[in-house]
Amino acid sequence: MRYFEDIELGEVWDLGERPVDENEIMAFAAHYDPMPCHCDAVAAKESYFGSLTASSWHVNAMAMGLLTNIFKAQGLVSLGSPGINSVRWFVPVRPGDVLSGRSTVMAMRASNSRPMGIVTLRTEIFNQVRSKVAQMDGVGMYGRRPAKAGNNLS
């Protein structure tokens, strides 16, 4: 298990990569962001982007999937998130793109009221040519290392 105390300020996590599939783009859009540029390949050709593009919310969901895989791989004791401070999108994500990313620990502090630490992560997502497609500054809550039994001197 990896606790708040094991995280270091400035630490960078490689999030790995994932391909982006046309069917996945259209399925997500059909349910959550049914704009023609996301769910209709023919109409998308006439859009501002000139082709099918992933919804920005889909990009966020894919980024969260990459990040969550790292939490599991590292055994991080993640307790959820109170929110995202900022989200920016820079370049459209298209079918056939391969997304990769990194998260950097930007700030951290122990909670004054609960047995957890608060960590701000900057997550950057790139396409296969290393163009930044998105950036999120999010806040996460992480479990504190349990006190060892028998250490109570009172």
Task: Name each model-derived stretch.
Residues 2-9, 91-154:
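HotDog/MaoC-like acyl-thioester-processing domains
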Residues 1-83, 145-154:
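Hot-dog-fold acyl-thioester-processing enzymes
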